């Protein structure tokens, strides 16, 4: 049996930027002294004149990106999620969101999988923050194939886009030959009748593995990959919830404001359903090896399996 390929989606981001850079001269990449970590260094090596390192000044980088977009170019500004969505939030809101400028935000090192960097760098609130900005598209890809497709789709979309990437190498489960990405459209990975599990980001693969354990217990779960949290695929969410009658959401993010909240916003209006939100429960993260933290917070396959089983039974 061949070894499962693993790639960090931040690497996918860097590779996708290089490929886009070959095709589009209007692509400008900005970074805040983190080109090695965000992987925009790949773009810098290929197109040094179109890679601008602003230094540790994320608010300034955001304003510059807004200006670049106003001049007709397509900027991708890059930093850790904690800094892109956290430190520079006011500028993202007012300089990019309010005038609805065509800026793409590549936010890496999101969630607890940042690992040893600890709570100060483990951004668990970014999806919620970005969802609140009118007109902002929010994408959280699950693997290398999806992440590279998402970067391309973000370039083609006219308007602000927040792309969430991780530090941890995760399994590549999508088939590049057949995979199709569309902003705002969820993907049914497996149909089921007993419960729907909506997952996003690195939690998608863990949910796929959890489903195998659930199946062994006679629980027929429907698994849906929600790569775009805003705009959410309302039609698919409602259709699946009505079909199974029970809903679970799984995310490497606070249960407040993220995928779970987005799904509940839709269901309370269109299809009231019992929902279990699996994520980070209103606490800060902590320092530790990424895989150990994922297990501790119940976001690994076994943790998801146990919570869903108890919920369904």
Briefly describe each language-model feature range.
Residues 1-164, 169, ...:
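Thiamine diphosphate
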